[in-house]
């Protein structure tokens, strides 16, 4: 099922930046917010509690990648924060991903729904050349992504983070219900930044993405609220 709200990546260094940004929006508007490593390492759980207290959904983007026991215990803790989605690196392997899900299930308070758990396949900043030269994965980028997606599905996770360019083949290799969350989304004419594989909101919708993540085109816009609504309208067109 496609989420009708673009996920806003709040890649800010300070908690105060989050407050300043969210205060621009009408209090009645429920957003879907992505909180990443830098912000969580700086502000800790309080930033999650704050965003949730405003009625927004939270994707906590920490990309866990460690031994299974460590990931399981970490997910047990993260589940208590009330987040709506978390992630791991698929490169950690099936055993690690199974442990992550087990930790989430055990840590989710009674009466609450377990946070969605997705895995990163290849980062959108990774080109095939980088993958082959640095990671020594000597397949095509597409083959690597599909393999990771299949391993993620095998582990029982809800979906993957992937480029919109791979969505159709991932769903064909897993299932239509398998979530594809796609970063690297840029409105027509926007700068690509450090993203190698990008797509517009309209293109991502057409190709079957379930969630899109948009950061700088919203957070660095002259009018973030107007930019958000324009991207949301394009995504839902």
Swiss-Prot record:
SUPFAM superfamilies, sorted: Ribulose-phoshate binding barrel
Keyword terms: Decarboxylase, Lyase, Pyrimidine biosynthesis
Pathway(s) the chain acts in: Pyrimidine metabolism; UMP biosynthesis via de novo pathway; UMP from orotate: step 2/2
Quaternary assembly: Homodimer.
Stated family: Belongs to the OMP decarboxylase family. Type 1 subfamily.
Function: Catalyzes the decarboxylation of orotidine 5'-monophosphate (OMP) to uridine 5'-monophosphate (UMP).
Protein's name according to its UniProt entry: Orotidine 5'-phosphate decarboxylase
Organism in which the protein naturally occurs: Lactococcus lactis subsp. lactis (strain IL1403)
């Amino acid at each position: 099922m496609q989420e009708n709200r673009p996920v806003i990546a709040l890649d800010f260094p300070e908690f105060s930046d989050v407050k300043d940004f969210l205060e621009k929006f009408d209090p009645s508007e429920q957003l879907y917010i992505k909180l990443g490593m830098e912000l969580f390492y700086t502000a800790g759980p309080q930033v999650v509690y704050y965003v949730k207290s405003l009625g927004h959904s939270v994707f906590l983007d920490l990309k866990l990648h460690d031994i299974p026991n460590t990931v399981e215990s970490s997910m047990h803790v993260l589940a208590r924060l009330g987040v709506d989605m978390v992630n791991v690196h698929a490169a950690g392997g099936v055993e690690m991903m199974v442990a992550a899900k087990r930790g989430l299930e055990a840590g989710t308070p009674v009466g609450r729904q377990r946070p969605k758990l997705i895995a990163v396949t290849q980062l959108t900043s990774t080109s095939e050349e980088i993958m082959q030269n640095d990671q020594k994965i000597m397949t095509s980028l597409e083959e690597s992504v599909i393999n990771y997606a299949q391993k993620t599905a095998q582990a029982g996770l809800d979906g993957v983070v992937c480029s919109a360019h791979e969505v159709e083949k991932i769903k064909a290799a897993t299932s239509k219900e398998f979530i594809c969350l796609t970063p690297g989304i840029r409105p027509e004419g926007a700068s690509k930044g450090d993203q190698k594989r990008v797509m517009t909101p309209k293109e991502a919708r057409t190709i079957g993405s379930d969630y899109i993540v948009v950061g700088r085109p919203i957070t660095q816009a002259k009018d973030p609220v107007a930019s958000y609504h324009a991207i949301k309208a394009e995504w839902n067109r």
